[in-house]
Curated annotation (Swiss-Prot):
Pfam families: Helicase_C, ResIII, UVR, UvrB, UvrB_inter. Keywords: ATP-binding, Cytoplasm, DNA damage, DNA excision, DNA repair, Excision nuclease, Helicase, Hydrolase, Nucleotide-binding, SOS response. It comes from the Bacteria. Residues 435-601 form the Helicase C-terminal domain. This is UvrABC system protein B. Residues 31-188 form the Helicase ATP-binding domain. GO terms for biological process: nucleotide-excision repair; SOS response. The UvrABC repair system catalyzes the recognition and processing of DNA lesions. A damage recognition complex composed of 2 UvrA and 2 UvrB subunits scans DNA for abnormalities. Upon binding of the UvrA(2)B(2) complex to a putative damaged site, the DNA wraps around one UvrB monomer. DNA wrap is dependent on ATP binding by UvrB and probably causes local melting of the DNA helix, facilitating insertion of UvrB beta-hairpin between the DNA strands. Then UvrB probes one DNA strand for the presence of a lesion. The gene is uvrB. Belongs to the UvrB family. CDD domains: DEXHc_UvrB, SF2_C_UvrB. A motif (Beta-hairpin) lies at residues 97-120.
Amino acid sequence: MIRRQKNKKFELVSKFQPAGDQEQAIKKLTDGFEQGEKAQILEGATGTGKTFTMANVIAKLNKPTLVISHNKTLVGQLYGEFKEFFPKNAVDYFVSYYDYYQPEAYVPQSDTYIEKDSSINDEIDQLRHKTTSDLMSRNDVIVVASVSCIYGLGDPREYAASVVSISGGQEISRDVLLRDLVNIQYDRNDIDFQRGRFRVRGDVVEIFPAGYSDHAFRVEFFGDEIDRIVEVNSLTGEVIGEREQVSIFPATHFVTNEQIMQRALASIKDEMNIQVKKFEGEGKLLEAQRIKQRTTYDMEMMSEVGYTNGIENYSRHMEGRKAGQPPHTLLDFFPDDFLILIDESHATMPELKAMYNGDSARKQTLIDYGFRLPSALDNRPLKLEEFEKHVNQIMYVSATPGDYELNQTDHKVEQIIRPTGLLDPEIEVRPIKGQIDDLVGEINKRIDRNERVFVTTLTKKMAEDLTDYLKDLGIKVRYLHSDIKTLERLEIIRDLRLGKFDVLIGINLLREGIDVPEVSLVAILDADKEGFLRSTRPLVQTIGRAARNSNGKVIMYADSITDSMREAIDATERRRSLQMKFNKEHGITPKTIVKPIRDVISITKDSDEKENKESFADLNFDELTKKQKQTMIKTLTAQMQEAAKKLDFEEAANLRDAIMDLQKQVHEKKK
């Protein structure tokens, strides 16, 4: 069993001091929580330093903190910022580890069963393991998470009870340690040493913990006693330092043992028999035969190898929960007295609320047609009311708080003044006729000043067509769409800041928290098309993207001014007048935010090294002209031949694949 260290304190490191109206916001929020307020709202205009205010509140309250945001791009951005603010504390990243996920489903209309299919990102899985191990072992932890934190994660009590703790001088035989490691799902592999594995060389056992990316532990035995434990680089074997004691956390969050498995199998069999009788009684013989066959197969797999595809659907039985009882989630890994910060709460809270309903509808169809047992419904995200029961103290952070937050509390703190003196952007409404030509002219002005541009459209088709049109004009442009993978999204934002391209076009991905100070123009096409993406809150958020640059300007292309546009414009002008008044009183000249460009997610790669070592894999072939592609094919062919000479066949194969991809594109253009 492991004990959580409770004496660690958060240490905020920043060259900045609270400025503008940050100081009063920090004081009001901290005082409110210390006086017992359960919920508070920080209504902060874009660019006023809400993240810095959040960091100060965390440091002053000194409680384990969960920061939830509604999309992975923002989670990555916040994670990078909090790591800089708290370099001596544990800052963790927790999002869904699927790069690709096709949930199991059944479509009755066409009698189509869709098998679950997924692709797991190993780096994110490692970061998730680091999160839970940090929460179990220390109190100075900040976890930055997406809404996946309300999905099932296994029982934290079983997880903690399964931790293997070893120390120098401990009497334990090598074979007992190996058996303990196997029990917590570590694999022995003496050749391919990876996370969640161990290897044995005589009296030396090397363990690669699931939550580490490049460090392992070497345990040296003398007879039946641990002689020494050293931390080593998992790749080179270089000794990093000696350790008196280490805790090895399970390689899976869903810890089980023989006793739990046998109890679960008996419970699953009972439920299967009840469901078979129910279907037979209703005359649904196909469904009865289907559920019996599928469940029996799963039970045999679980009995023989301890696992089956879709084992998460039996989580209620594995954890011994009652029907309808909520699953264990990341929130259960926190101590009772913890703090929750909801970033961009107007978007995050509706998403938290929607998770359960969407999951439930899909699973009910699988149950009705005999593909899953009714207990599959209990492998689910938390309902909103279940999430609320976990809340000790919570702070909602947004430039435009939603109705839910406003109904939860009347303790609202406003933060309008930016430390840099920056004003809310000027807003201009221009007619739709000739909007593209007008936009091109505005883009070229920004390119001449080495500034960046955001363009938000209403449809995917328009975004794609506009991207192609601007490319043909020689403008460096990218289109940020929903199919782009998590870490690639962050790279695109980073490349925009670095100036690898000048214009980013999107639909709904540009609104909340995409923090690019270099952006001086935000163009909103079809601003008068009233609807979800052109209502007041989204418009205010979109306007805010230009508020981090002293030349910030927003152009709305519209033939009329809707109520939503009027509200957004009025709110912006109100803040702008307050900011101008503050600047005048204090003699402040607005200046663009200077923000370092960093490799947002990776905790293992050096961002500068990545910057210098440009790889062909980072290139977007779609942006190249036909002539550039042909030149690139020649260059890559030479590199491939060079790699083959050096016997670096993996690099040669990667280059070959890139060449084939380019040749295919050139060939298609000829057609």
